[in-house]
UniProtKB/Swiss-Prot annotation:
Amino-acid positions noted as binding heme in the UniProt annotation, renumbered to this chain: 337
Protein's GO biological process: hydrogen peroxide catabolic process; response to hydrogen peroxide
Reactions catalysed: 2 H2O2 = O2 + 2 H2O
Signal peptide as annotated in the record: none
Protein name: Catalase A
UniProt region (Disordered), positions on chain: 1-25
Listed EC numbers: 1.11.1.6
Cofactor list: heme
Keyword Iron: yes
Catalytic residues (positions): 55, 127
UniProt GO MF annotations: catalase activity; heme binding; metal ion binding
UniProt subcellular location: Periplasm
Keywords: Heme, Hydrogen peroxide, Iron, Metal-binding, Oxidoreductase, Periplasm, Peroxidase
Length: 494
């Protein structure tokens, strides 16, 4: 016992008794002066922090990014040069479920990566699918509301989901992926990851290239059917956490092959689709993926709350050689993610150890709640403004990226005008074999249980525009699963 550390209060005072409250007699009331009890209860009341608005349920691990290819002609980013090895953190998640949700629900999976580079943190905050449900961020809150609980019933609403999707044809690509085999991976290790957005590379010559990031699982793709997923949930609600944690604990380190698609800057003027549209992919035949490295996860967190729940990923975190694009949803996420962290974790969330850069940090931000770095980070207390004459941090012109080409008049443009929301879905549907199509149809039918007929018919019209077989297959699956028969097609459906 003499070798064990002494329990103390948070102020450092030794605690003589950690078993009994301070009372007036053995049966008496609690004394208000029992500051040890008050402190213990007060801390318990504050153990939980607000959960993420989306991607609340997550699992994570540490590892490394090793660059084996050569893309130095496209980017000056040091972490992407041949032979570079960068420590990193990955967090996988579901989108809709709360922290207590089951892991094996059909949902898009988050695939968020934080690279601790010598030039600052680089965050790539993607999903396990290359597209998403929206192309304009103005609709993101509305879409997420359909994935969360109904304000009156406090239940998930299939009606809300399909009503929104049927009124938003740009969602069809992601809906098709979600309802396919890819919508329910067996584990985080058996799915791909994608940056999803279009980013950019820029090199020392000031040349810009558009880029998409892909992370292809080396463990192979493994998926569950709805019935298999339900069986797993009946045994454990933490299947993803268990599989990831114990694989790493047992030395079975998961790996992903890192690939990039690269598009010359001026190619955006000749592609038949908008390369910055989050609902679209770049055809591999036009822009073949180039293998550049390997992502490996090899260390579990020592404390889940400190290192995974406190982790803050933001697309705004980039490094020299990597830039943004006119992708509208990316532009909004640059603001919204960092802002969400300031609400959830506090003004100085980047000073939480798991979020701290591994390189020197100097800036003129000061004060604020939970300021733990001594007021300012300039190295000189007299240099608390800029410009100054006291050797405070100075700007680095060499980090300036080349100009980004933009044009056009300011307006609220209809994002559906000029966009074909069916051609790429048709190409994807054509890749499915008969078994995959059958499961797609039955998954959609299962998800439509209880949805009003006019909403179903409106969605079936979208499926028909992709391919007649798509619409017919879902209609037959609806009849088999629910006895669904359309009496008439409503005005709304038309």
């Amino acid at each position: 016992m003499t070798d064990r550390p002494t329990i103390t209060t948070t102020a450092g005072a030794p605690v003589p008794d950690n078993q009994n409250s301070l009372t007036a007699g053995p049966r008496g009331g609690i004394m208000l002066q029992d500051y040890q009890l008050i402190e213990k209860l007060a801390h318990q009341n504050r153990e939980r922090i607000p959960e993420r608005v989306v991607h609340a349920k997550g699992w994570g691990a540490f590892g490394s990014l090793k660059i084996t290819g050569d893309i130095s002609q496209y980017t000056r980013a040091k972490c992407l040069q041949p032979g570079a090895e960068t420590p990193m953190l990955a967090r996988f998640s579901t989108v809709a479920g709360e922290q207590g949700a089951a892991d094996h629900e059909r949902d898009v999976r988050g695939f968020a990566l934080k690279f601790y580079t010598d030039e600052g943190n680089w965050d790539l905050v993607g999903n396990n699918t290359p597209v998403f449900f929206i192309r304009d961020p103005y609709k993101f809150p509305d879409f997420i509301h359909t994935q969360k609980r109904h304000p009156k019933t406090n239940l998930r609403s299939a009606t809300a989901m399909w009503d929104y999707w049927s009124l938003s044809p740009e969602s069809l690509h992601q809906v098709t992926i979600l309802m396919s085999d890819r919508g329910l991976p067996q584990t985080p290790m058996h799915m791909n990851g994608y940056g999803s957005h279009t980013y950019s590379f820029w090199n020392d010559a000031g040349e810009r290239y558009w880029v998409k990031f892909h992370f292809k699982t080396q463990q192979g793709h493994k998926f569950f059917t709805n019935e298999e997923g339900e069986a797993v949930i009946g045994k454990t609600r933490e299947g993803y956490q268990e599989s990831l944690f114990y694989a790493i604990e047992n030395g079975e380190f998961p790996r992903w092959t890192v690939q990039v698609q690269i598009m010359p800057e001026l190619d955006v003027e000749k592609t038949p689709y908008n390369p910055f549209d989050l609902t679209k992919v770049w055809p591999h035949a036009d822009y073949p993926p180039v293998e550049i490295g390997v992502l490996e996860l090899n260390r579990n967190p020592e404390n889940y709350f400190a290192e995974i729940e406190n982790a803050a990923f933001s697309p705004s975190n980039i490094v020299p050689g990597i830039g943004f694009s006119p992708d509208k949803v990316l532009q909004a996420r640059i603001f919204s993610y960092a802002d969400a962290h300031r609400y959830r974790l506090g003004t100085h969330y980047e000073h939480i150890p798991v979020n701290q850069p591994r390189c020197p940090v100097h800036h003129y931000h000061r004060d604020g709640q939970m300021n733990t770095y001594g007021g300012i980070r300039t190295g000189n207390p007299d240099a608390y403004y800029e410009p100054n004459s006291f050797n405070g941090p100075a700007e680095q012109p060499l980090a300036k990226e080349p100009p980004l080409r933009i044009d056009g008049d300011m307006s609220r443009y209809d994002h559906r005008v000029g966009n074909d929301d069916y051609v790429q879905v048709r190409a994807l549907f054509g890749l499915f074999d008969e078994g995959q199509k059958s499961r797609l149809f039955s998954n959609i039918a299962a998800a439509m249980g209880g949805v009003p007929g006019e909403i179903i018919e409106r969605q079936l019209i979208h499926f028909a525009r992709v391919h007649p077989e798509y619409e017919a297959g879902v209609r037959q699956a609806l009849k088999t699963a629910h006895g669904y028969e359309a009496d008439t097609i409503s005005t709304a459906a038309e």
